[in-house]
Amino acid sequence: MSIKKENTLDYSKITATLMKTFNYKSVMQVPKVDKVVINMGVGDAIFNVKVLDDVVEELKLLSGQSPVITKAKKAISNFKLREGMPIGAKVTLRGARKEAFLYKLTRLVLPRVRDFRGISGKSFDGRGNYALGLKEQIVFPEINIDKVKKIRGMDIIIVTTAKNNTQAKKLLELYGMPFKN
């Protein structure tokens, strides 16, 4: 994934707005986005491990780096799941890749979601982190619809250094996240 300069935001404006809004004394108090974690759980991997190869390839395409395969922490007999079995993949984005992904998410991906009217403002965890779920991976421009074998969802967690939800919501609004009214 090539990271272009026009795909980034003007952080001096974001910092100035947040300092004015929350009356921070120092620039170091201003919250920022720490990392973005993209997770795809694959329940079918219990019966067919080769399904994970497609998920890993799709995550690699949309994030620009290799994902890590996640394994089951404990056995659940009803699901025929044993401890240590591969059940998904995740990727953690920081730095320039994080910025490019957030830009792409807010400007390209979310508007392509079917029946999109804005994201919920209730998905904060109380510590300034935001969780977002997408039902289909085909909304990303890098994913070729013809090569997708099965439509899968994913979780996107945006971890911020904000102390509470109001600071984090204002930060993400300045990043361009389209929240519902």
Curated annotation (Swiss-Prot):
InterPro entries (UniProt xref): Ribosomal_uL5, Ribosomal_uL5_bac-type, Ribosomal_uL5_C, Ribosomal_uL5_CS, Ribosomal_uL5_dom_sf, Ribosomal_uL5_N
Superkingdom, taxonomy of origin: Bacteria
Pfam families for this protein: Ribosomal_L5, Ribosomal_L5_C
Keywords, ordered alphabetically: Ribonucleoprotein, Ribosomal protein, RNA-binding, rRNA-binding, tRNA-binding
Gene Ontology molecular function, alphabetical: rRNA binding; structural constituent of ribosome; tRNA binding
Cellular component, GO, one term: ribosome
GO biological process: translation
Subunit: Part of the 50S ribosomal subunit; part of the 5S rRNA/L5/L18/L25 subcomplex. Contacts the 5S rRNA and the P site tRNA. Forms a bridge to the 30S subunit in the 70S ribosome.
Cross-referenced NCBIfam families: PRK00010.1
Function summary: This is one of the proteins that bind and probably mediate the attachment of the 5S RNA into the large ribosomal subunit, where it forms part of the central protuberance. In the 70S ribosome it contacts protein S13 of the 30S subunit (bridge B1b), connecting the 2 subunits; this bridge is implicated in subunit movement. Contacts the P site tRNA; the 5S rRNA and some of its associated proteins might help stabilize positioning of ribosome-bound tRNAs.
Family, similarity comment: Belongs to the universal ribosomal protein uL5 family.
Protein name, UniProt field: Large ribosomal subunit protein uL5
